[in-house]
UniProtKB/Swiss-Prot annotation:
Organism: Vibrio parahaemolyticus serotype O3:K6 (strain RIMD 2210633)
Residues bound to substrate: 74-76, 116, 249
Residues engaged in binding ATP: 98-100, 107, 242-243, 298
GO biological process terms, semicolon-separated: lysyl-tRNA aminoacylation
Entry's EC annotation: 6.3.2.-
Database matches in Pfam families: tRNA-synt_2
Catalytic activity: D-beta-lysine + L-lysyl-[protein] + ATP = N(6)-((3R)-3,6-diaminohexanoyl)-L-lysyl-[protein] + AMP + diphosphate + H(+)
Enzyme class (EC, first level): ligase
GO molecular-function terms, A-Z: acid-ammonia (or amide) ligase activity; ATP binding; lysine-tRNA ligase activity; tRNA binding
Protein name per the record: Elongation factor P--(R)-beta-lysine ligase
Gene3D superfamilies: Bira Bifunctional Protein, Domain 2
Keywords: ATP-binding, Ligase, Nucleotide-binding
GO cellular component: cytosol
Protein function: With EpmB is involved in the beta-lysylation step of the post-translational modification of translation elongation factor P (EF-P). Catalyzes the ATP-dependent activation of (R)-beta-lysine produced by EpmB, forming a lysyl-adenylate, from which the beta-lysyl moiety is then transferred to the epsilon-amino group of a conserved specific lysine residue in EF-P.
C-alpha cells in the first residue's frame, strides 16, 4: 500500500528550525539558565476546564490492574518541583500533548519552550521574552497593553466592570449572538470575545503583550496586590497568533489547592470528569517556591512566524495526520 510517508516540512525548513532552536538554547546559556528534562507522563494532571488530556495505563509488574498516567499538557508542575528543590532559573524544550484541535496552528503533540526566572515578576519576564522574540523573529520591540485596555480599545466594553448584557451586546456585533446569548459563564464569554474580536486586531506589526488578566482567569498566577480584580498573568500575540502564556507564579499552597478544587467542581457542573490533583506540586509549594515568574511558548508557532510559513505543518516533520 502506498502511503504519504514524506515529511510535510522541507529538509531546508527543518535545518532552519534546528538553527533557531540552537539559538534559543544559546540565549539561555548566555543568561546562565539551566536546561532541564522532566517526565512526559504523570499520575496527576491539569484541572483547567479548557484543557483536554491524553491518558494511558501502565500495566507492568506490580500494576496488573493498571496505573493511570496522563501525558503532560505542560512541564509546569514538574519544573516547579525543581524550583522548590533549589534548581535556580531553569528552562526546557519539550513535547507537550493536548487532546484538542488539529489544524493550521494546532497539533495534538507539539514543541513547547517553558522557562522560569527566580526573582523576576511578570513584567521583568516580559522584558526578557521581548529580547528573545526580537532575536528569533527579527521584529521590533513589542507593544504592551492591559487586558482591560485591549477590550476597551477594540470592542468598546470593559471586561472587568461591564455587565453580561454589555458583553453579549459586544458579541452580537461580532455575529456571535447564537453562541453568546445562552452563555452564563462570564469567563467563557470573555474568552470568546477575546479570541474572535481582539486577537486578530493586536500585534500585527510587532508582538503584543497583554497583561493583567481578570482574577477569575488567574490559573497558577498571583492576584495583583494593587488591584484584586486582575491577576499577574500575561499572554503574547503576533499576527493574530497566540504565542505564549506567562505568570508571576502563585506560591501559596492553600490558594493553589483551592483553585484546583474549584476547577474540578466546575468540571463536574459541566458534565466533565474531575482530574487528579497533583499533590506533589502542593507539597513543593508548602516546602517553599521561590518568588519567580514563568512562561510557556509554542515553538512550532514561533518558528512558523520566523520562517514566514502559513501552517505549522510546514515546520514540523510529521504532523498528526501522518504521524
Amino acid at each position: 500500500m502506498q502511503t504519504n510517508w514524506q515529511p510535510t516540512a522541507s529538509i531546508e525548513q527543518l535545518r532552519q528550525r534546528a538553527t533557531l532552536i540552537a539559538a534559543i538554547r544559546q540565549f539561555f546559556a548566555e543568561r546562565q539558565v539551566m536546561e532541564v528534562d522532566t517526565p512526559a507522563m504523570s499520575h496527576a494532571t491539569v484541572t483547567d476546564i479548557h484543557l483536554h488530556t491524553f491518558q494511558t495505563e501502565f500495566v507492568g509488574p506490580g500494576y496488573a490492574d493498571g496505573s493511570k498516567l496522563f501525558f503532560m499538557t505542560s512541564p509546569e508542575f514538574h519544573m516547579k518541583r525543581l524550583l522548590a528543590a533549589g534548581s535556580g532559573c531553569i528552562y526546557q524544550i519539550n513535547k507537550a500533548f493536548r487532546n484538542e484541535e488539529n489544524g493550521r496552528y494546532h497539533n495534538p503533540e507539539f514543541t513547547m519552550l517553558e522557562w522560569y526566572r527566580v526573582g523576576f515578576d511578570h513584567h521583568k519576564l516580559m522584558d526578557e521574552m521581548d529580547d528573545l522574540l526580537q532575536l528569533v523573529l527579527k521584529c521590533g520591540a513589542a507593544q504592551r497593553m492591559t487586558y482591560q485596555q485591549a477590550f476597551i480599545d477594540v470592542l468598546g466594553v470593559c471586561p472587568l466592570e461591564g455587565s453580561m448584557t454589555e458583553l453579549k451586546a459586544a458579541a452580537s456585533k461580532l455575529g456571535l449572538s447564537d453562541i453568546a446569548e445562552p452563555e452564563e459563564d462570564r469567563d467563557t464569554l470573555l474568552q470568546l470575545l477575546f479570541s474572535v474580536g481582539v486577537e486578530n486586531k493586536i500585534g500585527q506589526d510587532v508582538p503584543a503583550f497583554v497583561y493583567d488578566f481578570p482574577a477569575s482567569q488567574a490559573a497558577l498566577a498571583k492576584i495583583n496586590p494593587q488591584d484584586h480584580r486582575v491577576a499577574d498573568r500575561f499572554e503574547v500575540y503576533f499576527k493574530g497568533i497566540e504565542l505564549a502564556n506567562g505568570f508571576h507564579e502563585l506560591d501559596n499552597p492553600k490558594e493553589q489547592l483551592a483553585r484546583f478544587e474549584q476547577d474540578n467542581a466546575k468540571r463536574i457542573e459541566m458534565g466533565l470528569k474531575p482530574q487528579p490533583i497533583d499533590y506533589h506540586l502542593i507539597s513543593a509549594l508548602e516546602a517553599g517556591l521561590p518568588d519567580c515568574a514563568g512562561v510557556a511558548l509554542g515553538i512550532d508557532r514561533l518558528i512558523m512566524l520566523a520562517l514566514g510559513c502559513d501552517h505549522i505543518d510546514q515546520v514540523t516533520a510529521f504532523p498528526f495526520p501522518i504521524a
